[in-house]
Amino acid sequence: MTFSNNFHRLETRLQSQVGRAIGDFNMIEDGDTILVCLSGGKDSYTMLSVLMALQKRAPVDFKLIAMNLDQKQPGFPEEVLPNYLKKLGVEYVIVEADTYSIVKEKVPEGKTTCSLCSRLRRGVIYRTAKELGANKIALGHHRDDIVNTFFLNMFFGGKMKSMPPKLATDNGDHIVIRPLAYCAEKDIASYARAMEFPIIPCNLCGSQENLQRKKVKEMLLEWERQTPGRIDNIFASLRNVVPSHLADTDLFDFNGLTTGLAKIGEDALFGQTAYDQAPLVFAGSHDDRIEFVRFERKPGDKSAEQAVPGEAAAN
């Protein structure tokens, strides 16, 4: 398989982003055994490929075990992943659990099955990780998934919450990591096409994509078309949270806020300009008038300032 220079740049970018996410969130440590969950889709294939590449030059020693859950969906190509993983030379396990029949039994015809299916799948994954002695579980969610989930929770759940790059399971037995947290879906799709991964369709169960999630995804794609880089900025905001400028009393002690405390960023209260602005200083007051004047710095003098008379900020 011959790759272009563009592909090598893409591969380098993905590996760099995954490496940075691993470092920023301390996702992988020496001695870890990581269960890498494979669905047969572009995201999980890319995750495994990048993790295997990074494993070869990582400063710490860790073990990867690829896992696929055969949920007994009609038409599931059972031989695709085992053949691919054997060829790849990675340790793997195929777990068989008939969650499909349970979902079909519990969910009314025509309703979305994804929520129940996800819960059942999660339980099987956790039990498998325990059985194999894996302390970390790697999932293939990427940057766009994280942003999408953020808006879903905000619009339909009234919470500022998303998929964290790293979290502990409820019972505390395992750490879940999302190594693709910094990676854009379009880059992953391009990489998967170039690598010619044997993609397994995600709609074998016959369930339709969640309508709310679909609408949010379409909204984000339209925003990105209108203003390229917007999704990057939204994701960056998830990493730059200022609790004092939100409204959650559990995150910030608004009741205890008083004068005399260190400033918490007045720019966010009154608006921040993108240009240098000469300061206005108090000049005096008389009758019903208060006057502020603008100061200008003398050329070459960073400390001295000279007033410009007659320019009042308040009339």
Swiss-Prot record:
Binding, [4Fe-4S] cluster: C114, C117, C205
Sequence motif PP-loop motif, residues: 39-44
GO cellular component: cytoplasm
GO biological process: tRNA thio-modification
Major location (coarse): cytoplasm
Gene3D superfamilies xref list: HUPs
SUPFAM superfamilies to which the protein is assigned, alphabetical: Adenine nucleotide alpha hydrolases-like
EC numbers for this chain: 2.8.1.-
UniProt keyword list: 4Fe-4S, ATP-binding, Cytoplasm, Iron, Iron-sulfur, Magnesium, Metal-binding, Nucleotide-binding, RNA-binding, Transferase, tRNA processing, tRNA-binding
Cofactor note: Binds 1 [4Fe-4S] cluster per subunit. The cluster is chelated by three Cys residues, the fourth Fe has a free coordination site that may bind a sulfur atom transferred from the persulfide of IscS.
Coiled coil is among the record's keywords: no
Record-annotated membrane-spanning stretches: none
Cofactor names: Mg(2+); [4Fe-4S] cluster
Catalysed reactions listed for this entry: cytidine(32) in tRNA + S-sulfanyl-L-cysteinyl-[cysteine desulfurase] + AH2 + ATP = 2-thiocytidine(32) in tRNA + L-cysteinyl-[cysteine desulfurase] + A + AMP + diphosphate + H(+)
Family affiliation: Belongs to the TtcA family.
NCBIfam families: PRK10696.1
Extra remark beyond the main annotation: The thiolation reaction likely consists of two steps: a first activation step by ATP to form an adenylated intermediate of the target base of tRNA, and a second nucleophilic substitution step of the sulfur (S) atom supplied by the hydrosulfide attached to the Fe-S cluster.
Name of this protein: tRNA-cytidine(32) 2-sulfurtransferase
